[in-house]
Amino acid sequence: MDDNIINWLQKWTISQVNGDWEHELGVSITMLDNPGWILCADISEYFDFVLNSVPTGGKLNNDWLDYYIIAKEFSAYLYINGDLKKLNHLLYIFRGIIQELEKIKNEGKGILTVDRIKYIVDNVSNELLDTPAGTSL
């Protein structure tokens, strides 16, 4: 498996393009004014496996990370926010959540709970802390 996060994001995005998905939210990464980053993704393909959630991350001055899912009317959107030093985190967390949703979808049962998302976030954060600079997960 290719561990380059940008290559993974490109491949996943290509797999989602169906004539409709890309005209809606698709995937976007933009800067927030507080300042920080936000990754937004249309994850409606996984609607049956997600629940609405409220922001569940933590904020501590300039070191923060937040994430939540909005699911309604057969649409689902994932939002991952972080301070300016968290762009890499956002991308790897997104990949971890999508990989978990793929697993649930393939098994045909289960729900991605807030606790499971927190586990993914914590796991990614720990792996990034343990990864030497200049290398990838």
Name each model feature, range by range.
Residues 121:
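Short beta-strand-centered aromatic/proline hotspots
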